[in-house]
Amino acid sequence: WIRMLEQNVYLDVAWGGASFAREDKLIAIPIDLLGGILGVRAMVIRRDDRLKFNNITSLAMLKKLTACQAEHWPDTAILEASGLKVHKTAIFETNFRMLEKGRCDYFPRGIHEAYSEIEKYQILWGNQLILYDELLLVYPFNMWLYVNKENQALAQRIEYGLKQAINDGSFKKIIQTHPVTNHLFPLAHWQGKRLFVINNPLQNIRNTKEAWWLLREFPFYQQIDFSQAKD
């Protein structure tokens, strides 16, 4: 889709994770489509490992374990840049199988998607794996809309509309009511979680309201300082 937008054929707008490379080629509309929570990761783990994860109290301890990730995901490079060990897979579903077989110890998933994914997994394959959300791995990772560099008018119009949706509450309402993301609420559920904040060397960090408009409402937001994120 990047090439199609660059060449201004077939597509007028597309969504994707933030990166220096994409922002160099396209106009990124800096209104986060998930409110800044894309980089907030819970862990899919083996059910028998719950106690082990209860006892993880530092990033150094997590670095002794191995994450499963798809080899082509930006998250893989983000984790490796912070010194986390990663077992790479070619297909999304393979991550669950590798975790079952002990090839890795955890599979980090965005909190907006993890609950529906583990529910689907358990229906298909049983209850060997669970979602562990007492420990969150957090890194800055935005989700932008992109348009061709020559399409300034479209970019401005989309930015105006998204800002209006944030300000009138309708954007948040979509996330609150969508069946994939409604489990995030009430946000008080996220009080008292253990956080490990790491750096993202792949994107420009924007300190704007629109980049983190939903994340700012989470009870742990004040614990996050991306400028002090660890490598």
Regions found by a protein language model. Give the residues of each.
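Extracytoplasmic small-molecule ligand-binding "clamshell" domains
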Residues: 1-23, 158
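Short helix-initiation/N-cap motifs at beta->coil->alpha
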Residues: 1-4, 87-101
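A ligand-binding cleft/hinge motif common to bilobed small-molecule-binding domains
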Residues: 13-26, 108-128
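Solvent-exposed loop/turn segments at secondary-structure junctions
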Residues: 19-22, 50, 72-76, 93, ...
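A conserved helix-loop-strand patch within extracytoplasmic ligand-binding domains
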Residues: 32-77
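Periplasmic-binding protein-like
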Residues: 36-42, 123-156, 181-205, 212-217
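Ligand-binding cleft/hinge of the Venus flytrap
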Residues: 55-61, 71-91, 118-126, 230
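Ligand-binding clefts/hinges and TM-proximal coupling segments of bilobed small-molecule sensing domains
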Residues: 70-81, 162-230
